[in-house]
Curated annotation (Swiss-Prot):
One of its GO terms (molecular function) is serine-type endopeptidase inhibitor activity. PANTHER family: OVOMUCOID-LIKE-RELATED (PTHR47729:SF1), SERINE PEPTIDASE INHIBITOR, KAZAL TYPE 2, TANDEM DUPLICATE 1-RELATED (PTHR47729). The record marks 16-17 as: Reactive bond 3. Keywords: Disulfide bond, Glycoprotein, Protease inhibitor, Repeat, Secreted, Serine protease inhibitor. It is found in: Secreted. Residues 4-54 form the Kazal-like domain. This is Ovomucoid. It comes from Haliaeetus albicilla.
Length: 54
């Protein structure tokens, strides 16, 4: 299982860095910050499927 540490999130602004991650919702997030903000918004129900585009 691949895990991303989202303990420092949410953040108000994410960088434009592009390092895509695929969430368990089959959505591609542009970077860890975008993904972790979504994880926080989902109350932890969203998980990482894999690194890279979905």
């Amino acid at each position: 299982i691949t895990i991303v540490d989202c303990s420092d999130y949410p953040k108000p602004v994410c960088s434009l860095e592009y390092m895509p991650l695929c969430g368990s919702d089959s959505k591609t997030y542009s970077n860890k910050c975008d993904f972790c903000n979504a994880v926080v918004d989902s109350n932890g129900t969203l998980t990482l499927s894999h690194f890279g585009k979905c």
